[in-house]
From Swiss-Prot:
This is PKHD-type hydroxylase YbiX. One of its GO terms (biological process) is DNA damage response. The gene is ybiX. InterPro entries: Oxoglu/Fe-dep_dioxygenase_dom (IPR005123), PKHD_C (IPR041097), PKHD_hydroxylase (IPR023550), Pro_4_hyd_alph (IPR006620), Pro_4_hyd_alph_FE2OG_OXY (IPR044862). Binds 1 Fe(2+) ion per subunit. One of its GO terms (molecular function) is iron ion binding. 2-oxoglutarate binds at residue 168. It comes from Escherichia coli O6:H1 (strain CFT073 / ATCC 700928 / UPEC). Fe cation binds at residues 96, 98, 158. Keywords: Dioxygenase, Iron, Metal-binding, Oxidoreductase, Vitamin C. Residues 78-177 form the Fe2OG dioxygenase domain. Its EC number is 1.14.11.-. It comes from the Bacteria.
Length: 225
């Protein structure tokens, strides 16, 4: 399943990020990809050795960790270190699949269950640059407002179309979920959304408490901690 997570960063935060990123040191994006990805990748990434990068990636982690909808959809166990990329002048990233595991500074290794892109450019400011994701439900083309995030299974083939005008800047990361199975995670997300909707309409009740009990028992049964 694919999820749109709105408002991860406020417009003020996005403007501040863009101002900082204009001063950042950018390097060839192929430095962080494997042999297969390097053949189809043509973009730039912020140099991860800089102090500016360390500060910005920490802010992204704080923002997603504090976003209730992100947590409900991803049920994250481990988040990768966020990276930042830039596309301009017909740069693109052809169809590829993300690696199944990635190194992690604290945990050694993490499994990539979900991929996330946090958009930092207004969609009207550039042409092209759509994230195209192929999954069991078909092909999805994504170009979200700045500050919004998209979550999708890391097992999906995906690409970024050429940016023919302007500049597309984004942050991206991977998530190891407490729930490995996409279908089970989607069911828990739907159940959680329905519980929250019922509570907002009817307040607390024995029936809602029973559903909440079911949610946590399923989470207990399926989670890998």
């Amino acid at each position: 399943m694919m999820y749109h997570i709105p408002g991860v960063l406020s417009p003020q935060d996005v403007a501040r990020f863009r101002e900082h990123l204009e001063q950042a040191e950018w390097v060839d994006g192929r430095v962080t990809t494997g042999a297969q990805g390097a053949q189809v990748k043509n973009n730039q990434q912020v140099d991860t050795r800089s102090a500016l990068y360390a500060a910005l990636q920490n802010e992204v982690l704080n923002a997603v960790n504090q976003h209730a909808l992100f947590f409900a959809a991803a049920l994250p166990r481990t988040l990768s270190t966020p990276l930042f990329n830039r596309y301009q002048n017909n740069e693109t990233y052809g169809f590829h699949v993300d690696g199944a595991v990635r190194s992690h500074p604290q945990n050694g290794w993490m499994r990539t269950d979900l991929s996330a892109t946090l958009f930092l450019s207004d969609p009207e400011s550039y042409d092209g640059g759509e994230l195209v994701v192929n999954d069991t439900f078909g092909q999805h083309r994504v170009k979200l407002p700045a500050g919004d995030l998209v979550l999708y299974p890391s097992s999906s083939l995906h690409c970024v179309t050429p940016v023919t005008r302007g500049v597309r800047v984004a942050s991206f990361m991977w998530i190891q979920s407490m729930i490995r199975d996409d279908k089970k995670r989607a069911m828990l997300f739907e159940l959680d959304n329905n519980i929250q909707s019922l509570k907002s309409h009817y307040g607390e009740s024995e029936e809602i408490l029973s559903l909440l009990n079911l949610y946590h028992n399923l989470l207990r049964e399926w989670s890998e901690i």
